[in-house]
Amino acid sequence: MASNGAYPVLGPGVTVNPGTSLSVFTALPFATPSPGPTHRPPLVTAVVPPAGPLVLSAFPSTPLVAGQDGRGPSGAGASNVFVQMRTEVGPVKPPQAQTLILTQAPLVWQAPGTLCGGVMCPPPLLLAAAPGVPVTSAQVVGGTQACEGGWSHGLPLPPPPPAAQVAPIVSPGNAGPWPQGAHGEGSLAPSQAKARPDDSCKPKSVYENFRLWQHYKPLARRHLPQSPDTEALSCFLIPVLRSLARRKPTMTLEEGLWRAMREWQHTSNFDRMIFYEMAAKFLEFEAEEEMQIQKSQWMKGPQSLPPPAPPRLEPRGPPAPEVVKQPVYLPSKDGPKAPTACLPPPRPQRPAETKAHLPPPRPPRPAETKVPEEIPPEVVQEYVDIMEELLGSHPGDTGEPEGQREKGKVEQPQEEDGMTSDPGLLSYIDKLCSQEDFVTKVEAVIHPRFLEELLSPDPQMDFLALSQELEQEEGLTLAQLVEKRLLSLKEKGCGRAAPRHGTARLDSSPSEFAAGQEAAREVPDPQQRVSVETSPPQTAAQDPQGQGRVRTGMARSEDPAVLLGCQDSPRLKAVRPTSPPQDHRPTCPGLGTKDALGLPGESPVKESHGLAKGSSEETELPGMVYVVGSHHRLRPWRLSQSPVPSSGLLSPGGRGPQGALQSPSAQKRGLSPSPSPASKSKKRPLFGSPSPAEKTPHPGPGLRVSGEQSLAWGLGGPSQSQKRKGDPLASRRKKKRHCSQ
C-alpha cells in the first residue's frame, strides 16, 4: 500500500507527470519460477495523474523476472501486478482496482473497461530506460518533469500538443545496439518497431526539451544565482539528470543536482558551447511564445476576463516546422559521456549553499570572449618613443640661452638651440662670467640690436642674423666697432630727423631753411648718445686737460653753422625730446624754457644770477666759446635758422657742461638766462627725465616769432648795455683769448 508522506523516489522507466490531482500507486515485485535465485526489486512509489494513461517500461537495473544472467528467461510469460490507486486531493473515495500487466514485451497500463490489447498513449514527457546500455556518466535523475512536478512542490504543467504524446516502450529483453539518438532521447528499439504498429512513436521533439529547459531554469538559478550560465546549465541538466536516474534510481534530487553541478564545473568550454547554442535557441522560442501570448490577449480585448490560469499557447503554424527540424544537441552520440575530472574548471566554483533568489541574469552570449583585449606591446613602445621625442624637444626651448642672455653673454650659433652638453664648456663660461673684467668688456662690445630685441616684447628674435653680424665684428677692434655703430646710428638719425624738419612751423625764408638743413646734416642724431656712453672710456685720454666729458666719445664739431644752429633754437628745445649732439662737450645752450630766456618784464635778479653762474663755471670752457661769440656777433641771430634737432641734451636750468655753456652764450646774444630753483641744488643725469617745461611744450605764438622780432629782441635787450660797458664781460673775453692762444 502507498503511504501519503512517503518521499518520492523515482525508478527507471516510470512515467511521472504531476498535475493538480495526483494519485499514489505502489508497484509490488513478483517472482516467477526460475532456476536461478530470485532478486526482489525495491518498493517503487510514484506520483501519477488519474486522468492520463500510465505506461510503465521494464526495470532495466533490477528486472522483475530475473534469470541467471539478470534478465530472466526469454520465454517467460506475462505476470500481473495489482496496484491500489487512490486520490489525494478531494474527498476520499474507495480505491479503484486497476491491473498492471508486466511482460517481457512492451508493458501496457490497462484501466478497467479497456481492451487488453489496446495501447494507450503515454504522457508527453516519458523516459524509457534502455537495457543493455552501460550507464557510466551522471545523467538525469528520474523522469523528465519529475523534479519540477514531484520534487518542486507541484508546479503546473500545460497540456502537451498531440504530436508529442507518444513515448517509446522498451522491453528489458532488448540488448541490441541503439540507433542514432540513443540515451533514451526518443529512438526506438528494433524489437519495438517489429512488435506493433501502434507501439511505434515519433521521436521526442525539441519542444519537449524546451519545456524541460523551462522547468529546470529555477533549479539552475538557485545554484548559480548571479551567473550568466543559468540557461546553459538548464540545458545541461536535461541529459545529466536522466542518466543519473538510470544509474541510481534511489538518488534524491539534492544529490542529483550536486553531482550535476560538479559535472558542469569539470566540463570544458568546448563541450559547453553545445548547451550555450541550445539555450540561445530556447530563449528565442520563449520570446516568440511570449509574443504569441500577448497577441492572443490583445485579440481577446478587455471585454472578456482572462481565465485564472491561462494555459501557455504553443507555437503553431509556421514556427512549428522550424521547431521540429531543429536537432537536439547532446554531448555525444555513441553513448553517455564519462566525467572528465582531469580538466581544470574554467571559472572558480561558486558554493552550492547560495540559494538566494535574485533577478534572472541577462541571456548568455557564447560568442563573446570575457577576457579583456590587451594593447600590443609594439604599439605601447611606439607610443612611448613618440612621447619621449616630444618631451625631449621642449627643455631646449627654455634652457640655457635665457640665463645667458640675462648675464649679457653672446652665444655661438651652435648653442642657439640650448642643447649645449659639454660640461667643460659650461664650466669655462661660468668661470668667465664670474670675472668682472670679462663682463665689463662684454658689455662694452655688446650689440645694440641684441639689446633692442632682448628688451622688446616680441618673443621671436632673429638669432641667425645677429650671429652673422657678431661673426663679422669679431675681427674688428674696439675703435672700429665704435665707429661702425656711430655710423649706423647716424644713418638712423638722419632718417628720423627728416620728418622733424617738416614739422617745424617757422616763419623763415626758403634760403634760410635750406641753410638750416645743411647745418642739420652735420649734426648727429640724438640717439647716438646711447651707444656712445656704452663705449669704454678710452676717449678720456684724448682730453688730457679734463675739460671734455668722458661720456661723450665723438669728435668735436668745428662748423660754426652747427653751433649757431644749435644756439638759434631756444624755443624748439621745449618741443624736441631730450638728446644731446654728439661732441666731447655740448655746444648747444641749455635754453628751452621761458625761465632761461631774458624776456622783457622779468626781474633783474634772474639776470644777475645768470651772470654769476656763468662766471663761476667759466674755467671749464675751452676756447670754442670765443669762436661762438665772434660768429654770433658777425651774423644776426634769427629764430628761423633753427630746424636742427639740437634740444634735449640738457634740462632747462641744468648744471655741469650745460650750465657752463648756458650763461656765456646767452650773454653773447644779449640774453640773461636764469635757471630754475630746482636746478641749483643738484645736477641732472644725462638720461634723466625732462623737466615739466619740456614735457609740456608750448606750440603757441612763441614758435612763430619772425626774424625781425627776434633780431630786435636780441640786439635791443637790456644786456646790450652791459656789453657796451664791458664791465664784467670784457675782462672775461680777454682771459679766454689768452687761454685759447
Curated annotation (Swiss-Prot):
Q: In which residue ranges is the amino acid composition biased (Polar residues)? A: 528-545
List the biased-composition ranges (Basic and acidic residues).
402-412
> Which residue intervals are annotated with compositional bias (Basic residues) in the record?
731-741
Q: Region (Disordered) spans which residues? A: 172-200, 293-375, 391-424, 496-624, 638-741
Write out the biased-composition intervals (Pro residues): 304-321
Spell out the PANTHER family in the cross-references.
NUT FAMILY MEMBER 1, NUT FAMILY MEMBER 2F-RELATED
What family is it from? Belongs to the NUT family.
- What is the protein name given in its UniProt record? NUT family member 2G
Q: Which gene produces this protein? A: NUTM2G
